[in-house]
Design a protein with these regions (language model features):
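Alpha-to-beta junction loops
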Residues: 68-73, 94, 176, 197-202
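Short acidic active-site motifs
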Residues: 60-64, 83-84, 136, 189-193
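A ligand-binding cleft/hinge motif common to bilobed small-molecule-binding domains
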Residues: 79-90, 201-212
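A short, structured surface patch at a secondary-structure boundary
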Residues: 14-79
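Short beta->alpha connector loops at strand-helix junctions that form conserved
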Residues: 76-77, 97-100, 182
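Bacterial Sec-exported substrate-binding components of ABC uptake systems
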Residues: 1-23, 120-150, 198-201
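Alpha-helical, coiled-coil/dimerization segments enriched in small aliphatic residues
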Residues: 39-44, 159-186
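Extracytoplasmic ligand-binding site segments that recognize negatively charged/polar headgroups
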Residues: 83, 96-113, 144-166
């Protein structure tokens, strides 16, 4: 995996995924039926939301994951806490840790590693090729639109995506520019700062909008 550890598996039938992009990739490879558990960030495709949830990927519990009887756990290096990852590994259940980096190259490498783990290398190559083809089709604007992504979780908490986030990467891939570039990660932002960023578009997730 991305940590240099060797992960040995044999035709896994019960997979737990601990990242939205990992979940989406497994579904795209045609193996969604083999997923028995997902983390709270796994909102796409819609079928993923019907799987057993094991909590937010940064705060999962070994007991919740192992109770599903998985024969493979696929996570990113952002999953945790670390002692839980070690508990899963010590239980004998294979766990593959992939990079959570957000560049295009990192996303392609992640897809290829997941495809190799699941013996779907041909399908993985097709996914990567399709990604590259779609990127070439993105319309290039002389003045790319400024896009603001708000991750709302209710209770008045509105975190805005800065650089080095999956939202920032997706905005770039779609031909836009992030309206917020003066910090990395997600941070709260008040109404005045939101207006000052002068976005052309503001994005929410469906669930985030409902929580406001």
């Amino acid at each position: 995996d991305s940590t240099g550890k060797t992960v040995t598996i044999d035709n896994p039938q019960k997979i737990v995924t601990l990242s939205g992009n990992v979940t989406e990739t497994v579904f795209a490879l045609g193996l969604g039926d083999q997923i028995v558990g997902v983390d709270a960030s796994s909102l796409y495709p819609e079928e993923a939301t019907k799987k057993s949830q094991v909590g937010y990927y940064r705060r999962v519990s070994a007991e919740g994951i192992l109770s599903l009887g998985p024969d493979l756990v696929i996570a990113t290096d952002a999953a945790g806490p670390p002692n839980v990852i070690e508990q899963i590994r010590s239980s004998g259940v294979p766990i593959a840790i992939l990079s959570s980096a957000h560049t295009i190259k990192d996303a392609q490498t992640r897809i290829e590693l997941i495809a190799k783990l699941l013996d779907k290398e041909k399908e993985g190559h097709i996914l990567v090729w399709n990604m590259e083809d779609e990127m070439k089709q993105v319309i290039k604007h002389e003045a790319p639109p400024k896009v603001l992504f708000i991750y709302a979780r209710g209770g008045g908490t509105q975190n805005v995506a800065g650089t080095d986030t999956s939202a920032d990467a997706m905005i770039s891939l779609a031909g836009g520019v992030n309206a917020v570039t003066d910090y990395s990660g997600y941070k709260p932002m008040n109404a005045e700062a939101l207006i000052a960023s002068a976005p052309d578009y503001i994005l929410f997730t469906d669930r985030g909008l409902e929580s406001m």
